[in-house]
């Protein structure tokens, strides 16, 4: 509709809008009102993508941009999490996310976090399924391994060094399985448009993501920081590309 109104080429057949919608849905709590994803979708497609020139021109991940917009605008709705347990009951239970409980010093169930029997957004509850999907994308060479691996490893090292729990492997596993890390590392940070294309750039990008996520999680006011870390690093991609792009042999020599 926007492209028709602005007399632009119609690109709906490339399915990029559908992919953005799917990723946005994975970033939402399971019981949000229907108008929340509608507003988020409009923001992602029109504000983040189309206003900057359409597919390939957006400076940050559209789904994450919409998620942050919704968090700022409708914080109460976006942080109201509920889930149905695996025990067969259909009564939703409202609770804090595991990362929020962990930050408050409470005990969390690592097995439930790994399998997905816990509160959170749709795409951050089952670390197991996200890992399977991420490994599949890497095996099929749809995404590079550099960004997700460097991201997860760097965050893990940051947590061990600055998490205040020493080398507690259980605490480390809880940090890695909780929140949007797996979703962000494999499905959001690897977006072709908003991530570096050079191998060195992808490594630097992943390391920066891990450091920023660790800072936001451990020292910030919120228990989560994946979305903000990815968006911030999206803004640094041009600089990362400039620094890590190899100079052509002989460039700058005498003519």
Where are these regions (language model features)?
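C-terminal ends of transmembrane helices
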Residues: 1-9, 45-56, 130-141, 186-195
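Hydrophobic, membrane-inserted alpha-helices
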Residues: 17-26, 41-48, 129-137, 153-159, ...
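Alpha-helical transmembrane segments and their membrane-interface exit regions
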Residues: 1, 42-51, 67-72, 154-159, ...
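Long hydrophobic alpha-helical segments that form multi-pass transmembrane helix bundles
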Residues: 56-131
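Structural signature of hydrophobic alpha-helical transmembrane segments
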Residues: 31-40, 113, 117-127, 169-181
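Membrane-interface helix-loop-helix junctions at boundaries between adjacent transmembrane segments
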Residues: 12, 16-17, 22-90
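Cytosolic-side transmembrane-helix boundaries in multi-pass membrane proteins
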Residues: 218-255
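Loop-to-transmembrane alpha-helix initiation sites
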Residues: 59, 63, 172-180, 202-204, ...
